[in-house]
Amino acid sequence: MDSNKETKFSIQYGPKDILDKKFKNKVRGYDPDEVDEFLDGIIRDYEAFTNEIDRLKEENTKLFSRVDELTKQLSVSKNVSAQTPQTNAAATNYDILKRLSNLERHVFGSKLSDSSVDNHDDGNHSDVDQY
């Protein structure tokens, strides 16, 4: 959504136009004081509506900015979380293989000189170093 998009509508009279409007007196016309009092009430309402519209436009702009900010944060967070498991999985596999290799050396270390173990283990641990 575009935060700069505003609904345009035609306003015929502003509060100042209503205040400054002078009516002609006719013989059988309305009481000018009553008309003025009524129009003063309309002016107050009109100004209140105008202030509320301005406040809502400002709030709308702030909310669109906040949505944009949160969308960017979410995008960054998704990118980081998508990369993190791959990195952690590779590191975890490497750590497991390293610990397994150390455990094998500890358990079978004294037997590595035996010929029976040498027949099954060629001493090549290059697959451990690959990870």
From Swiss-Prot:
Keyword Acyltransferase appears in the UniProt entry: no
Main location: cytoplasm
Gene Ontology biological process terms, A to Z: cell division; regulation of cell shape
Chain intervals with Basic and acidic residues compositional bias: 117-131
Coiled coil: 39-76
Protein's UniProt keywords contain Cell cycle: yes
GO CC term (a single one): cytoplasm
Region of interest called Disordered, as start-end residue ranges on this chain: 111-131
Protein's cellular compartments: Cytoplasm
Keywords: Cell cycle, Cell division, Cell shape, Coiled coil, Cytoplasm
Oligomer and partners: Forms polymers through the coiled coil domains. Interacts with PBP1, MreC and EzrA.
Role played: Divisome component that associates with the complex late in its assembly, after the Z-ring is formed, and is dependent on DivIC and PBP2B for its recruitment to the divisome. Together with EzrA, is a key component of the system that regulates PBP1 localization during cell cycle progression. Its main role could be the removal of PBP1 from the cell pole after pole maturation is completed. Also contributes to the recruitment of PBP1 to the division complex. Not essential for septum formation.
Family: Belongs to the GpsB family.
Official protein name in the record: Cell cycle protein GpsB
Taxonomy of the source species: Bacteria, Bacillati, Bacillota, Bacilli, Lactobacillales
Gene name linked to the record: gpsB
